[in-house]
Amino acid sequence: MTTFKQQTIKEKETKRKYCIKGTTANLTQTHPNGPVCVNRGEEVANTTTLLDSGGGINKKSLLQNLLSKCKTTFQQSFTNANITLKDEKWLKNVRTAYFVCDHDGSVELAYLPNVLPKELVEEFTEKFESIQTGRKKDTGYSGILDNSMPFNYVTADLSQELGQYLSEIVNPQINYYISKLLTCVSSRTINYLVSLNDSYYALNNCLYPSTAFNSLKPSNDGHRIRKPHKDNLDITPSSLFYFGNFQNTEGYLELTDKNCKVFVQPGDVLFFKGNEYKHVVANITSGWRIGLVYFAHKGSKTKPYYEDTQKNSLKIHKETK
C-alpha cells in the first residue's frame, strides 16, 4: 500500500550513529545542516564549577557560561542579559536575553532576541502573507499530530500549500537555528528528539516532529486560546520563532503564574516548558504576529505511527486490533 508520505514527501536519507555509553558522545545524528553531537548531561556539565561558597548555584557564573555558548554558537553578543532560578521571582518585563534555570543548571526558559537574519524573516513573512490570502484558518501544521487519537498521523495540512511550505522550505532552515539553540541550552531535549521515529524527521525536516503555525491579526483575534493554559500534551520544551510586523509593546507572551511578560519580536526565539508554565499571548492592535511553535507530544513516542492521514490511519489502526 502506498502511504501518504510516499505520495507527497520526497524520501530523505537520515543517518544515525549510536555511540557507546560513557564516551564523549553517546549519539550523533547527521542532518542536512550538519551533525548534531550530544553528551547526556551536557547541560549540567561542570555544575560543580558553578557553585557558590554555600553550595548553591552561582547564577553569575551560570549566566556567563550560557552567554559564552550562545555567543560562540550564534556569532553574536547578547547584551544586558539576565538570569533567574525557577523558584525565584522572575523578571516582570523581558526585552533582552533571559534565562530561567533549575538548581542543577538546566534551562527552563531561554529568550534570545534577533537570532534569525532579517532577510530570512522578511522572506518567510512575505510568503506566509501570500499563502494566508487564500486560507480561512489562522492556524496550520506540518509533521505529525496525535491529539485525541490513539496513534500519530500525518497532518492534513501537508497536502496544502502552507504545510508543504513549512516542511520543504521553512523547517529545514529553522532547524539550523533549533540545533544551535538546543546545543546551547538543552542537550537533554536533543537526546529525546533524536530518539524518536526516523520517519518523523524525514516527514517534517526538523528535529521536532511537529510544527504549528499561528497567525494573529487584530481582525482575527477570536480564533486563539485566550485563557492562560499549559500545553499538557507536550513532552519536551518547545522552541518558538517569530515573524510578521507588530508593535514591540503588544503580542507578548505572558507566563501568568510567574507574572512575567516576554516581549517577543520578529526574528526572536523562545525556548520554554509550555507543559509546565501557564502562558497566554497578548492582543495586538495593528500589524501581524506570526508564531512558529516546534513541539513534541507525549504520543510521538508512546503511540503507533502508520505514516498516513488521520482517516486512513484510523482504518489501519482498527484493522490491527
Swiss-Prot record:
Outcome of mutating residue 297 to N: Strongly reduced enzyme activity with DNA containing 5-methylcytosine
Cofactor stoichiometry and binding remark: Binds 1 Fe(2+) ion per subunit.
Cofactor field: Fe(2+)
GO MF terms, alphabetically ordered: 5-methylcytosine dioxygenase activity; double-stranded methylated DNA binding; iron ion binding
CDD domains found in the cross-reference section: TET-like
Reactions the enzyme catalyzes: a 5-methyl-2'-deoxycytidine in DNA + 2-oxoglutarate + O2 = a 5-hydroxymethyl-2'-deoxycytidine in DNA + succinate + CO2; a 5-hydroxymethyl-2'-deoxycytidine in DNA + 2-oxoglutarate + O2 = a 5-formyl-2'-deoxycytidine in DNA + succinate + CO2 + H2O; a 5-formyl-2'-deoxycytidine in DNA + 2-oxoglutarate + O2 = a 5-carboxyl-2'-deoxycytidine in DNA + succinate + CO2 + H(+)
Binding site for 2-oxoglutarate: 214, 224, 242, 289
Keyword terms of this UniProt record: Dioxygenase, DNA-binding, Iron, Metal-binding, Oxidoreductase
Location of the Fe2OG dioxygenase domain: 198-298
The protein's Enzyme Commission number: 1.14.11.80
Site (Interaction with DNA): 148
Keyword Amino-acid biosynthesis: no
Residues that hold substrate according to the record: 310
Entry binding sites for Fe cation: 229, 231, 279
Domain of life: Eukaryota
Effect the entry attributes to changing residue 310 to A: Reduced enzyme activity with DNA containing 5-methylcytosine
Domain remarks: Has good structural similarity to 2-oxoglutarate-dependent dioxygenases of the TET and the alkB families, in spite of very low overall sequence similarity.
UniProt function note: Dioxygenase that catalyzes the conversion of the modified genomic base 5-methylcytosine (5mC) into 5-hydroxymethylcytosine (5hmC), and thereby plays a role in active DNA demethylation. Also mediates subsequent conversion of 5hmC into 5-formylcytosine (5fC), and conversion of 5fC to 5-carboxylcytosine (5caC).
UniProt name for this protein: Tet-like dioxygenase 1
Provenance organism: Naegleria gruberi
